[in-house]
């Protein structure tokens, strides 16, 4: 009884944190994209139990996702420029209806760029996990870690900090997994390689996505 009460209290605190974050964030700017996904679902509803990818532009621009994992049923619900709180807020519209077997989240970089601390981003991640598992307790959540870019190199240490906190969280939560992609764009000198980015030096090009797919593939096949 005590363990149940404690678990319920932890969930309540997490959901209260979600509510507080949402009252100070503008979600309206994503309405057009979210509505477009819902309209598409009416004519081509994704299969239940699929692998759902959600997050910011790294997910949205992953056009080769179905080809990279041809033997899996994958659903892309990324919306560029979004933060973790956006995926949490819109979960009831672009996660829950599909009842995915796994949710792959790649987000957090925009959060840091907009001034959030690594601790705040990690807190938002925990809120995301709580929201998803409140509705889908058996769905595995896979965090695709943050990785540095040329354009945002100055936040690389904060990205490392977020990754480290998520890794520690995963150790205590077996229903959550972590994919380390931080080294993916780095060269032998420890700097991001221009050849894996498009002209904006922020987003991956085809070569970058090829490397990303290699990192993610073992978690798709499990």
Where do the PLM segments sit?
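N-terminal secretory targeting modules
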Residues: 1-53, 59, 63, 67-68, ...
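Extracellular glycan-modifying ectodomains
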Residues: 44, 93, 110, 126-135, ...
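Catalytic His-Asp segment of secreted/periplasmic serine-dependent ester chemistry enzymes
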Residues: 148-222
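Structural recognition of the beta-strand scaffold that forms the well-ordered cores
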Residues: 51-54, 74-78, 102-107, 140-145, ...
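Sec-exported extracytoplasmic/periplasmic mature domains
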Residues: 92, 96-99, 108, 130-137, ...
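Charged helix-capping and loop-helix junction motifs
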Residues: 118-128, 158-163
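Cell-envelope and extracellular/periplasmic
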Residues: 78-80, 104-117, 126, 133, ...
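Oxyanion-hole/transition-state-stabilizing segment in secreted/luminal serine hydrolases
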Residues: 59-75, 84-122, 142, 146-150
């Amino acid at each position: 009884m005590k363990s149940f009460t404690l678990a319920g209290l932890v969930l309540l605190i997490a959901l209260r944190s979600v509510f507080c974050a949402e009252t100070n964030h503008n979600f309206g700017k994503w309405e057009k994209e979210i509505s477009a996904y819902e309209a598409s679902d009416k004519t081509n509803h994704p299969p239940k139990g699929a692998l759902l990818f959600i997050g910011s532009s790294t997910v949205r621009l992953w056009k080769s996702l179905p080809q990279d994992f041809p033997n899996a049923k994958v659903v892309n619900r990324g919306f560029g420029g979004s933060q973790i709180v956006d995926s949490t807020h819109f979960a009831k519209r672009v996660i829950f209806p599909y009842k995915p077997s796994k949710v792959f989240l790649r987000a957090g970089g925009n959060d840091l760029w907009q001034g959030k601390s690594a601790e705040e981003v990690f807190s938002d991640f925990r809120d995301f996990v709580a929201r998803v598992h409140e509705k889908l307790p058996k769905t595995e959540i896979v965090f695709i870690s943050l990785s540095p870019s040329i354009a945002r190199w100055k936040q690389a240490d904060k990205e490392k900090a977020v990754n480290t906190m998520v890794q520690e969280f995963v150790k205590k939560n077996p229903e959550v997994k972590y994919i380390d992609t931080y080294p993916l764009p780095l060269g032998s000198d420890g700097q991001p390689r221009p050849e894996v980015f498009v002209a904006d030096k922020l987003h991956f090009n085809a070569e970058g996505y090829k490397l990303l797919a290699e990192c993610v593939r073992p978690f798709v096949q499990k």
